[in-house]
Design a protein with these regions (language model features):
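Active-site-adjacent substrate/metal-binding segments within catalytic domains
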Residues: 6-140
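Basic/polar N-terminal segments that are highly enriched at the extreme N-terminus
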Residues: 1-5
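Active-site groove signature of glycoside hydrolases
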Residues: 95-96, 137-153, 157-180
């Protein structure tokens, strides 16, 4: 696969984006922030709920239904503003995060990973859109694979390995074709 224009590297104790230190020459309240990778946890960019009993909880007020592609569309549309405000990175997760905060019970099924460890194509298409836009903006996303409350949906150690290998493969497991 072709290399992405935005490359992340570590040089001693600082992050580099495309060969340049992040926040070059900048300070905050007298502290050097050059080389840091400021990020925000935005785990729900590829979110969907496969549980019919809980899916309606996330419906949009204007349509009365949940739409995972709209969720990703809105996420992608907001990214330039985040970048303009100085955010260089965000954390996204293939199993999302708890949509209600730190819930004890998580009946929803938000996993982009099937029980056998294969990566769900619809989640990967949404992730590809986010990663492509991040690349265009010169951002370096952090992609998480598992999330507590959803990790039990992956069957066994072999499935865990399959998910990790798929996510860490060429282009982060993101398919080169079939993007929207």
């Amino acid at each position: 696969p072709a290399a992405r224009p935005t490359e992340i590297a570590v040089d001693a104790d600082r992050f580099l984006l495309s060969g340049k230190p992040t926040y070059a020459g900048r300070t905050y309240k007298g502290l050097k922030i050059e080389g840091l990778l400021l990020n925000s946890r935005m785990a729900q960019g590829v979110f969907d709920d496969r549980n019919p009993d809980t899916r309606a909880k996330w419906r949009y007020p204007d349509t009365g239904r949940w739409d995972p592609d709209r969720n990703t569309d809105e996420f992608v549309a907001a990214m330039p503003e985040w970048r303009q405000c100085g955010l260089l990175s965000f954390t996204i997760n293939l199993q999302g995060g708890s949509p209600e905060g730190y819930s004890k019970s998580q009946p929803w099924d938000t996993s982009g990973i099937a029980a056998n460890g294969s990566l769900r194509a619809d989640y990967m298409r949404r992730l590809a859109r986010i990663l492509d836009r991040a690349d265009e903006l010169g951002m370096a996303p952090i992609v998480g694979v598992f999330y507590f409350g959803q990790d039990q949906r992956v069957r066994n150690e072999a499935a865990v390995r399959r998910a990790v290998e798929g996510a860490a493969g060429p282009r982060g497991g993101v398919p080169a074709a079939g993007r929207r």
